[in-house]
């Protein structure tokens, strides 16, 4: 058979859903947790995020190089998809198991909290990079038919968009509702909000891992290629920099940085300004903000493959 089965397609899309659940929890929930639950300093959050992005920037080409060189009998991508979900879950959960910064009484304790937050977040980013690169590369190996490959990637983008929008809308209100419940039981708002956030985010992380894990076991790679020639990481980076398309992608990522920062800030603004940190309903404001953005992503994800087939990928994405 030259292409994937319906079962493989379903498992792959469920895995994409699970992976984006995990990513959404970290992207939305962890920022809120750092800022509004354990009260890390803004400078510390910025530094941790910067270091994590640098680690991911170096990790991406390294993982691609490892996948190209792979000669494993399970396939180039499946090995990473089998072994990456559990470390991703462990590091993502560790990100939420930290003491409030304001509860530390000594500088050593405060430094320990910052180190724990930074190491767990950077560890998550590195582990997630292995799973992410393998997951998005897998459709190229699951089928020999270009039309089927493009269709699967388009469906994956739609699933990722739906999941991202859903987790953004649900995560903070659910965490704050659970936090208010625990706060009333313990008469301690800080402890209650921390417990509520850990419970809700941990549940989503566990569900995402359950959906993500089967992809490596239940899919098949049909495209085979000889291992790529061995080159160092720096040789690969130099080769990529000589490619005009790579420089365009890098520039595009830099230009999108402000919008990414806005996405991180908007949930905090909505939660505090409109929702009084969970004490006032504010979901309708989130819907007003999120629905247009979600529809735009959905339309773009569905239209991009068709435009690429008609006009060429270089023209469409230039």
Predicted regions and their residues:
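Membrane-embedded alpha-helical bundles of multi-pass transporters/translocases
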Residues: 1-318
């Amino acid at each position: 058979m030259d292409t994937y089965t319906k079962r493989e397609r379903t498992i792959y899309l469920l895995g994409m859903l699970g992976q984006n659940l995990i990513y959404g929890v970290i992207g939305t929930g962890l920022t809120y947790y750092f800022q509004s639950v354990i009260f890390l300093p803004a400078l510390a959050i910025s530094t941790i995020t910067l270091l994590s992005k640098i680690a991911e920037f170096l990790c991406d080409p390294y993982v691609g190089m490892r996948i190209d060189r792979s000669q494993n009998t399970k396939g180039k991508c499946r090995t990473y998809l089998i072994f990456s979900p559990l470390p991703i879950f462990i590091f993502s959960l560790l990100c939420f198991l930290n003491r409030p910064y304001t509860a530390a009484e000594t500088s050593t304790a405060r430094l320990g909290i910052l180190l724990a937050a930074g190491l767990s977040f950077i560890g998550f980013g590195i582990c997630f990079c292995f799973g992410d690169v393998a997951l998005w590369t897998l459709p190229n190996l699951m089928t020999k038919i270009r039309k089927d490959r493009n269709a699967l990637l388009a469906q994956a983008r739609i699933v990722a968009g739906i999941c991202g929008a859903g987790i953004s809308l649900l995560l903070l209100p659910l965490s704050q509702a659970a936090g208010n419940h625990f706060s009333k039981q313990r008469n301690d708002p800080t402890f209650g909000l921390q417990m509520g956030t850990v419970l809700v985010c941990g549940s989503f992380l566990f569900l995402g891992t359950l959906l993500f894990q089967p992809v490596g076991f239940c899919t098949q790679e049909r495209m085979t290629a000889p291992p790529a020639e061995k080159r160092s990481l720096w040789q690969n980076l130099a080769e990529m920099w000589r490619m005009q398309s790579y420089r365009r992608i890098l520039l595009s990522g830099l230009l999108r940085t402000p919008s990414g920062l806005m996405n991180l800030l908007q949930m905090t603004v909505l939660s505090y300004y409109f929702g009084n940190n969970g004490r006032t309903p504010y979901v309708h404001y989130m819907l007003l903000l999120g629905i247009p953005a979600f529809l735009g992503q959905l339309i773009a994800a569905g239209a991009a493959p068709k435009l690429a087939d008609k006009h060429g990928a270089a023209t469409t994405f230039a």
